[in-house]
């Protein structure tokens, strides 16, 4: 099922996305995301954004979509736990190590493959589903986006 997913790099873009009909927004919270150039959100702002979106029927996805070092994993685990506690609907990931970490730190939180995971075939999307990812953001250049499956 397709959804209109919009970036939210700060409060103004979050409100614009919601008011423009986005089904879901993705945003950075903390240091471990590919949206480092965006304003991103503090923990308190993230909680406010989740409440704002959920009151309007919009889902919130945390971006945890960069490659992490072993030293960064404990901080990422804490971030996953906080995001789950604050009501995030899912996490966009790139790194299969984060997939494993998330299964331990926040097993109830659905995982989505970010475009940074570089899935571009129907076979790759199916394998991600077999491994428990509930949504895949295909590369925009992907022919698999044309598939009916």
Specify the residue positions occupied by each region the protein language model found.
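N-terminal basic/disordered segments at the start of proteins
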Residues: 3-24
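Glycine-rich, proline-tolerant flexible connector loops at the mouths of alpha/beta enzymes
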Residues: 26-44, 64-70
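Active-site-proximal loop/turn and secondary-structure-junction residues that shape catalytic pockets
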Residues: 9-12, 31, 64-68, 96-98, ...
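Single conserved hydrophobic/aromatic residue that forms the stacking wall/gate
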Residues: 140-149
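Hydrophobic faces of well-ordered beta-strands that scaffold small-molecule active sites
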Residues: 4-7, 25-27, 60-64, 91-93, ...
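Alpha-helix-loop-beta-strand connector modules within alpha/beta enzyme cores
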Residues: 43-61, 102-108
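Conserved, mostly hydrophobic/aromatic
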Residues: 17, 95, 128
């Amino acid at each position: 099922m397709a959804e209109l997913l919009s970036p939210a790099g700060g409060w103004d873009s979050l409100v614009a996305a919601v008011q423009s009909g986005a089904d879901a927004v993705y945003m950075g919270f903390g240091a471990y995301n590919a949206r480092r150039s965006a304003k991103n959100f503090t923990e308190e702002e993230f909680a406010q954004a989740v409440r704002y979106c959920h009151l309007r029927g919009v889902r919130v996805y945390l971006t945890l979509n960069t490659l992490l070092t072993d030293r960064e994993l404990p901080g990422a685990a804490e971030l996953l736990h906080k995001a789950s506690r604050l009501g995030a609907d899912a996490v966009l990931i790139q790194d299969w190590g984060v997939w494993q970490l998330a299964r331990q730190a926040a097993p109830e939180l659905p995982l989505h493959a970010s475009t940074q995971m570089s899935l571009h075939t129907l076979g790759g999307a199916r394998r991600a589903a077999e491994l428990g990812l509930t949504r895949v953001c295909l590369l925009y250049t992907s022919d698999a986006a044309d598939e009916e499956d």
